[in-house]
Amino acid sequence: PPMTPAMPHGLNLSGEEAASKRARLAEGLKARGARAAIITLADSVCWLHNIRGSDLPHTPFVLGFAILYSDASSELFLDDAKHSPELIAHLVDGVRLRAPEEFVAALDALAGHAVLADPASAAHAVFDRLSKQKARILRAPDPCQLPKACKNAVEIEGMRQAHIRDGAALTRFLAWFAGAAAQGGLTEIDAAQKLEGFRRATGCLS
């Protein structure tokens, strides 16, 4: 599996501290009577903890799992190879780093509790394990997805700047394409590679 270091996603980019996000979502868990929520989607894990990585091409995610608790604490399950010094310094009180091998034991510790899990994203093994431990499973959407979609002012500005950079790269590509296509012999792969090259030149494409 990919083993790139996890890095902080700064407040200047996220617009909200990770602790604030956890606290907001924890209130929702308490309102539902849930002890915890199982977070398995990479984008949710990264958004909730304000971290990023390079485990996937062109997508700044680090692959792992998390459990968010109703007291606003969380457990983040990442391989040791992903524990960069920057990550350690970034994660403050309330977040416990654990090995992926400990995920099953963490599920077992929720025996008898109400636990939220998303059937659209969590693996069957998660539901099977919780069921065996007599947990009360609340099947509901990943609690990160809706808040993550509601962008704050900092995120909106970041999106605007990203579109400006990408728009400039696309404009350069179209200018090149107008000449290259007229000469003939151009393939879709040629065009795709050239466009990626213009986008890489922005310095913002992993």
What are these regions (language model features)?
Residues 1-206:
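Active-site neighborhoods and metal-handling regions in enzymes and metal-associated proteins
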